[in-house]
């Protein structure tokens, strides 16, 4: 037995080494609190439809708090389900063309709950290499055999499913990938899944509100809405201007998740304010479907300004390579009144650190002028090697 004697905090001394290594690599992250009135132009948030401060969305949250209180009070299975939760589930399912819906406390929890409940030790999971971290973590927790497929490689998927020994299989993909904004080949993936008896689970976090008729998502756009072997997961925190997540699928899947999804069973239900805000945002989107089209129009404007590839979603990536260059560029934008995202490893592969711009339907002419001026200056400076 080895006896280790040290100071009170010696057990965590290793964190100092980790922090130094992160700083040396340009990968240290810090929090920056927003003020109530932020004077910068926003190209960093996921408020794609510009609904976060919409009066109806704010009123929806306030009204729900007045009727139900500040919290859900318990698990969805005990006291945490209100009639508003059930209304939101039906409204979301109807909007995307699913048979039923189940609301979770976050999009992350929805993915963890759905994947672990629909897999297990006797299943195979094939997960796209570009999947969101929540799906990656779900794979780790699933106890299934996991195969990571090269990004958008349908032939690899076909071979993995054909060669499996497991009776059950679950295929995971984002509809719109968050780093580059590219689209999954959903129609081809579904054909392969149908041929080989696999379930296709699609994370529509960046698809709903942007892709499909009136923002119904890429699954709907590809004609896969309501298919019994397709499970859609979604977040309420992007286009729907709130917080929380949902699984939209068949009634059979919903019933199973209520019994088996641990992130549903053992977590407190979504707060009433978030439910009310999401319902109001969905109502606005139904009434104003042109918001979805406007997001893609603004994304094309951003691509033109930066010289990026024509976008298929709200996400426009400007790859700069080195993480310190990307951080400096983001800081230079901020100092000139423009807030942009900055993606570095492990969010993206080594050597592909980038500015990540997210389009918003409500960007106006004055804001676009600021965007064009600042991005032109900053990108010119970075590419010329001018220090921040």
Predicted features along the sequence, with ranges:
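Conserved N-terminal alpha-helix of the aminotransferase class I/II PLP-enzyme fold
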Residues: 59, 63-106, 299
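Active-site PLP attachment segment
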Residues: 222-256
């Amino acid at each position: 037995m080895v006896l280790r004697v040290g100071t009170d905090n010696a057990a965590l001394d290793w964190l100092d080494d980790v922090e130094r290594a992160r700083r040396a690599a340009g990968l240290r992250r810090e929090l920056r609190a927003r003020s109530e009135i932020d004077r910068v132009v926003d190209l960093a948030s996921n408020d794609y439809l510009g609904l976060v401060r919409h009066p109806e969305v704010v009123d929806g949250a306030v009204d729900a708090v007045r009727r139900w209180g500040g919290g859900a009070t318990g698990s969805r299975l005990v006291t945490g389900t209100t009639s508003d939760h059930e209304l939101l589930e039906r409204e979301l399912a109807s909007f995307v063309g699913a048979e039923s819906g189940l609301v979770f406390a976050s999009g992350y929890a929805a993915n963890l709950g759905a994947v672990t409940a629909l897999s297990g030790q006797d299943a195979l999971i094939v997960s796209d290499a570009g999947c969101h971290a929540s799906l990656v973590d779900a794979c780790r927790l699933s106890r299934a055999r996991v195969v990571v497929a090269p990004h958008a490689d349908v032939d690899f998927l076909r071979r993995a499913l054909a060669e499996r020994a497991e009776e059950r299989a679950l295929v995971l993909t984002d509809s719109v990938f968050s780093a580059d904004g590219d689209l999954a080949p959903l129609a081809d993936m579904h054909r392969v899944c149908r041929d080989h008896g696999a379930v296709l689970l699609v994370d529509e976090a960046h698809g709903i509100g942007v892709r499909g008729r009136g923002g119904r998502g890429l699954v709907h756009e590809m004609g896969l809405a309501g298919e019994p072997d397709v499970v859609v997961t979604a977040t309420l925190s992007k286009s729907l201007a709130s917080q929380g997540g949902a699984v939209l699928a068949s009634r059979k899947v919903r019933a199973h998740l209520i019994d088996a999804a641990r992130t549903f069973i053992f977590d407190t239900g979504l707060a009433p304010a978030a439910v009310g805000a999401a319902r109001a945002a969905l109502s606005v989107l139904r009434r104003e479907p042109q918001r979805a089209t406007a997001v893609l129009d603004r994304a094309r404007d951003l691509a033109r300004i930066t010289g990026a590839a024509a976008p298929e979603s709200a996400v426009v990536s400007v790859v700069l390579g080195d993480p310190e260059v990307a951080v400096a560029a983001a800081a230079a934008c901020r100092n000139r009144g423009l807030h942009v995202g900055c993606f570095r490893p492990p969010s993206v592969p080594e050597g592909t650190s980038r500015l990540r711009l997210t389009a918003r339907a409500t960007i106006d002419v004055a804001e676009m002028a600021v965007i064009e001026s600042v991005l032109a200056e900053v990108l010119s400076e970075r590419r010329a090697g001018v220090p921040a």
